[in-house]
């Protein structure tokens, strides 16, 4: 299990990529680039054919990964390869619940352990159904990451009291995707979550530029960035796949990712 111990001036930068997009070996290099860009932890997404929480950018990434033959087992093993190749930040497996259900639970947790996966995030599992999985995570020393969206304060308290690692605070209802602006009601909601939580609070769903990062960092402990990075991978995919242009494309990706991290001001 991991804890994110932040210094007062330090902010979380938690990027999301889809395992196997555009091809598995490039996913490893992308993870290393994100670590160099200042990532605090990495969300590694499992490609799924019916991703209810994801917008078109991540849906297309899932399709590219599925076309490569990716599945939950291969995604976990890819996380292990990342750890073997120098990624030492926590890796959080981001998966819908159905792929987990397809596996024997002991086998699933053994895979997580063997591949040094640090955390688990299941976006489509409501609070009422998550307790047994949370307990299993605890017994296997895997950090279960809780998602919170605007809801009643009593429900918020229940979710946040059980939170480990960090709280993933959903900035917008609906699917993931780049947003130019957020509803004004999101800011008091984030402040409420921050006041209730004893673990760091990271804001995700729609963070797409440096200005939004600065704004969210003022009221939370940092950001989760998914669609903006996955869209950049899509833009660079042909150059990332080609051995001749890969290094240059990886550097371009790292520079782009750094705008979301605490290293931006050091560059």
Curated annotation (Swiss-Prot):
The keyword Thylakoid does not apply. Signal peptide: none annotated. Keywords: Amino-acid biosynthesis, Aromatic amino acid biosynthesis, Lyase, Tryptophan biosynthesis. Pathway: Amino-acid biosynthesis; L-tryptophan biosynthesis; L-tryptophan from chorismate: step 5/5. The active site is at residues 43, 54. The keyword ATP-binding does not apply. It comes from the Bacteria. GO terms for molecular function: tryptophan synthase activity. One of its GO terms (biological process) is L-tryptophan biosynthetic process. Pfam families: Trp_syntA. Its EC number is 4.2.1.20. The alpha subunit is responsible for the aldol cleavage of indoleglycerol phosphate to indole and glyceraldehyde 3-phosphate. Tetramer of two alpha and two beta chains. Belongs to the TrpA family. This is Tryptophan synthase alpha chain. It comes from Bacillus subtilis (strain 168).
């Amino acid at each position: 299990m991991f804890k994110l111990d932040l210094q007062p001036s330090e902010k979380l930068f938690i990027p999301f990529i889809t395992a196997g997009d555009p091809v598995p070996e490039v996913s490893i290099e992308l993870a290393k680039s994100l670590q160099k860009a200042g990532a605090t932890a990495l969300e590694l997404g499992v490609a799924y054919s019916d991703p209810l929480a994801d917008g078109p950018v991540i849906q297309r990434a899932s399709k590219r990964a599925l076309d490569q033959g990716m599945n939950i087992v291969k995604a976990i093993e890819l996380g292990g390869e990342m750890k073997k190749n120098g990624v030492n930040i926590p890796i959080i497996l981001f998966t819908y619940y159905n792929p987990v259900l397809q596996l024997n639970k002991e086998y699933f947790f053994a895979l997580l352990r063997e591949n040094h996966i640090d955390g688990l995030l299941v976006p489509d599992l409501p609070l009422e159904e998550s307790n047994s999985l949370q307990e299993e995570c605890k017994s296997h020393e895997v950090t279960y990451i809780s998602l919170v969206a605007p809801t009643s304060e009593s429900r918020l308290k229940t979710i946040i009291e059980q939170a480990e690692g960090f709280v993933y605070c959903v900035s917008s209802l609906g699917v993931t995707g780049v947003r130019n602006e957020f509803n004004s009601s999101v800011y008091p909601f984030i402040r409420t979550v921050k006041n209730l939580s004893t673990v760091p609070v990271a804001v995700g769903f729609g963070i797409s530029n440096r200005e939004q990062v600065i704004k969210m960092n003022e009221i939370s402990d940092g950001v989760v960035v998914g669609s903006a990075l996955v869209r950049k991978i899509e833009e660079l995919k042909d150059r990332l796949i080609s051995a001749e242009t890969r290094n240059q494309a990886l550097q371009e990706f790292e520079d782009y990712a750094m705008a979301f991290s605490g290293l931006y001001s050091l560059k």
